[in-house]
Structures are given as C-alpha cells and as structure tokens.
Regions:
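Alpha-helical transmembrane segments of integral membrane proteins
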Residues: 6-14, 42-50, 80-84, 88, ...
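N-terminal, membrane-interfacial amphipathic/helix-forming hydrophobic leader that caps
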Residues: 1-70, 150-153, 207-222
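Transmembrane helix-loop-helix hairpins at the membrane interface
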Residues: 18-20, 113-222
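Sequence-level detector for tyrosine residue identity
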Residues: 34-39, 47-48, 102, 159, ...
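Juxtamembrane helix-loop-helix connectors linking adjacent transmembrane helices
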Residues: 32-42, 59-129, 136-146, 216-222
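C-terminal ends of transmembrane helices
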Residues: 24-33, 93-106, 159-170, 208-215
Length: 222
C-alpha cells in the first residue's frame, strides 16, 4: 500500500469512527428537545443528513471508494433469491414473535403506515450504509486478520452494540436479532457485491414486524 493510499485510509477510518459514534448517539439526536418543540421532523433529517454527508466524504477519500464500499449495482441474478429468502425469514420471525409475546397477530394500524414505512426505509438505508457498506468495506480493505469472515462478524457485533436503547432496556430478543440481522446482511452484501440488497432486506424485516406485530410495537420504534 502506497503512502497516499495509507493516508487516505487513515482519514477514512477517522471519519468512520465518527460515523459509528453518531449511530451510538442517534436516538438522542433524533429525539432532542431542541428539535421536538420546534420542528419534530428536523431531528431525524439532521441525523440522516449527517450520515449521508459522512458517507459521501468517505467515498471520495478512499481509493475506488464506490467499489470498496459496495456502492455498486448488485451482481446479476443475486438480488431476487436473496430478497425472497429474507422475506420468508422475516415473515416467519414476525409471526413467531407476535404469537410468542402477544398471543396473536396484531398488525400496525393503517393510519400509522406512511410515517412508519418512511422511517423504516430511512433507518434501513442509514444502518446498511454505515455498517454493511462503510464499516464492512473498510475492514476488508484494511485486510484485518481473519479476512472477510472476521470483517462480517466484527461489523455485526459492532452493529448490535450500537443498539444502546436495546441494551439499556435489556430487550435481548431484539438485541440478538440485531446482531443476526447484521451478520446476515453482511453476507448478503458480500454475495451480491453491493449494499443495495442488504438495504432492501433490512427494510423487509422491519416491515414484516409492522405487518404482524406492529399493533403492539407502535409505541416503541423498531
């Protein structure tokens, strides 16, 4: 690795650390009293805007940023099978969760669907951009010991640890589910050589919970 590449990698790693710390503090940013009593929508917009700004900076700094960070179209023939598999697993998980914890299916009220679907889409894109694109891509580019498998595991665990609310409230089901989701989406990204299928898959998992257990989860964001 040349000096210029090493310098670019160091800067990209620094920005990535800030990006991950931003994810750790995302709930406080989006629910800040400063925004809540003025423009409630400004908190989420500020957070997602910062994520995109950091991501753009890292893409431009890292050599061949789009390629190394999986910001390319999916390999032909990979997206549909991967998404179908995620849809099936997401639906089965949501049904099992609904019956295990709530005794039956309780869908999200239709009046709440537009805002929740928009939030789910934004969350899926931001999380996958942060962890499956940037963190995973940088770990692989840096050549950490253990190779691709270690990179997938590390980013999945880091993604789980970033769920501060789940840790604080000891919601072990969702915490373990977050790590498993991060691990699965990591391999989806590697398989498709693109983060796009992981974004869609993440969105499918969240919307499955809305469809089968959203009526009881509506007071708590997923």
């Amino acid at each position: 690795m040349s000096f210029e590449e090493s310098l670019r990698l160091s800067i990209a790693v620094g920005l990535t650390i800030f990006l991950v710390l931003l994810r750790f503090d995302s709930e406080r940013i989006m629910r800040s009293d400063y925004f809540r009593y003025r423009y409630p929508w400004l908190g989420p917009v500020s957070y997602y805007g910062l994520v995109i700004a950091f991501a753009i900076g890292i893409v431009f700094i890292l050599p061949n940023g789009r390629g190394h960070l999986f910001l390319t179209p999916a390999e032909p023939g990979t997206m549909l099978p991967l998404l179908l598999g995620f849809a099936v697993v997401g639906i089965l998980n949501a049904i099992g969760f609904a019956f295990r914890w709530y005794g039956g299916i309780t869908p999200l009220p239709t009046t709440l669907l537009p805002s929740r679907l928009l939030g789910a889409a934004a969350s899926a894109v931001a999380d996958e951009l942060q962890f499956r694109s940037i963190v995973l891509g940088l770990l692989i580019f840096a050549g950490i010991p253990g190779g691709v498998t270690a990179a997938v595991v590390v980013q999945a665990v880091l993604y789980g640890v970033a769920q501060r609310r789940l840790l604080r409230e000891r919601q072990w089901y969702f915490l373990i589910g977050s790590v498993l989701l991060g691990y699965a989406c990591g391999w989806v990204t590697i398989t498709a050589n693109s983060v796009v299928p992981a974004m869609v898959a993440h969105f499918l998992v969240i919307t499955s919970l809305f469809a089968f257990a959203g009526g009881r989860l509506r007071q708590r964001p997923i």
